[in-house]
């Protein structure tokens, strides 16, 4: 069953500025695997913005905000065909595991000015009182 839905939109211009002005931005937000992927794409701001939006959308689908974990606990990967996938680590994974088996569906897109990501989290069980059937 669907546990949560998250969507995030990011201005590519703001991500470009963050990359140019803050040497630590990429290292603070992305894992080594993600950085390698982004460097292979010359750190193009639209790709960085898409991955950033994806992390935000995943957090929203978890329904927790960044409580107890950080950006690197959510890794955005891709299949051989290019479909984006989510790998949860650390406390983000522990949080998702509370609901048994889970799957996160992810879509990322960008235009000239914005990048957007949409995440849907499916779980086996829901124990949160806010989510019980009436």
Curated annotation (Swiss-Prot):
Mg(2+) binds at residues 8, 56. Gene3D superfamilies: 4'-phosphopantetheinyl transferase domain. Its cofactor is Mg(2+). It is found in: Cytoplasm. InterPro entries: 4-PPantetheinyl_Trfase_dom, 4-PPantetheinyl_Trfase_dom_sf, ACPS, Ppantetheine-prot_Trfase_dom. GO terms for biological process: fatty acid biosynthetic process. It comes from the Bacteria. Keywords: Cytoplasm, Fatty acid biosynthesis, Fatty acid metabolism, Lipid biosynthesis, Lipid metabolism, Magnesium, Metal-binding, Transferase. GO terms for molecular function: holo-[acyl-carrier-protein] synthase activity; magnesium ion binding. Pfam families: ACPS. GO terms for cellular component: cytoplasm. Its EC number is 2.7.8.7. It catalyses: apo-[ACP] + CoA = holo-[ACP] + adenosine 3',5'-bisphosphate + H(+). Transfers the 4'-phosphopantetheine moiety from coenzyme A to a Ser of acyl-carrier-protein. NCBIfam families: acpS (TIGR00516), pantethn_trn (TIGR00556). Belongs to the P-Pant transferase superfamily. AcpS family. This is Holo-[acyl-carrier-protein] synthase.
């Amino acid at each position: 069953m669907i546990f949560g839905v998250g969507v995030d939109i990011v201005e590519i211009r703001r991500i470009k500025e963050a990359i140019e002005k803050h040497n630590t931005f990429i290292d603070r937000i992305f894992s080594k695997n993600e950085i390698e992927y982004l460097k292979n794409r010359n750190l193009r701001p639209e790709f960085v913005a898409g991955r950033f939006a994806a992390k935000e959308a995943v957090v929203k689908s978890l329904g927790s905000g960044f409580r107890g974990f950080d950006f690197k606990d959510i890794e955005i990967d891709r299949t051989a065909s290019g479909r984006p996938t989510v790998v949860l680590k650390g406390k983000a994974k522990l949080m998702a595991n509370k609901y048994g088996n889970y799957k996160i569906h992810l879509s990322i897109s960008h235009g000239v000015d914005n990048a957007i990501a949409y995440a849907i989290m499916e779980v086996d069980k829901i124990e949160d009182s806010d989510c019980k059937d009436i």
